[in-house]
Amino acid sequence: AVVFDPPPALWAEADXQQEPLRNLTQTVGQYLPTLSGXLAE
């Protein structure tokens, strides 16, 4: 499975404009492996 995990430097650069987007991406990133695991089983 491909996990979207940008380097911290990219997040630091985008903090000012994209904090909500980062939070959403982190939340999705936490749940995607769980969903994929359940579907794989």
Curated annotation (Swiss-Prot):
It is found in: Secreted. Plasma. GO terms for cellular component: extracellular region. Glycans are attached at residue 23. Its main location: secreted. Glycosylated. The keyword Glycoprotein applies. Keywords: Glycoprotein, Immunoglobulin domain, Secreted. Interacts with CRISP3. This is Alpha-1B-glycoprotein. It comes from Equus caballus (Horse). The lineage of its organism: Eukaryota, Metazoa, Chordata, Craniata, Vertebrata.
